[in-house]
Amino acid sequence: IQKTRTQLNDAINQALLVVEPSMSQVEKAMVLHDYLISTTAYTSNAGNAFRLTEVGVFLKHKANCEGYSRAYAILMQKVGIPVKFVSSNKMVHMWNEIKIGQKWYHVDVTWDDPMDARDKTDQYGRVSHQNFLCSAARMRKTKHYDFSTADATSTKYDNRYWKSINTVSYTHLRAHETRH
């Protein structure tokens, strides 16, 4: 267990290397969002017990929504951004809310990790931002339902240019260099 804990801490610290001191809260939240997506593939495989945990994300590089959410929460805490979990029982889904300035916003790292529509495989290195820094109203428009939150009412980031970008991320390049 101690070896896994050490490996996990090392992997978390590796992820944090993409954060630069001069970055704003939004930039930190985005670069860590992109890092997780660039280094993790979605899995719903029930045989993969780690899929529900940060170990699945940081050490196995495979996780489901709970694993992505737990990993993102750890990274947000490490960079001083308040974070909490949001879930929908009917969707059987989990994601985060983070606080930027004095406002809360939804972030669904899982749904921003693009999958090939034909064979449902991860599109390695591709990142979406449709579910990054969203109001509750926008989340409902992106097919999230059966969740309650009174906090995420600000629409400040709902129509930002990055919502329509689905591309190779900056962190993909760094992650690729680290792996090879």
Which residues make up each language-model segment?
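Extracellular adhesion/carbohydrate-binding repeat motifs centered on closely spaced tryptophans
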Residues: 88-90, 97, 155-156, 160-170
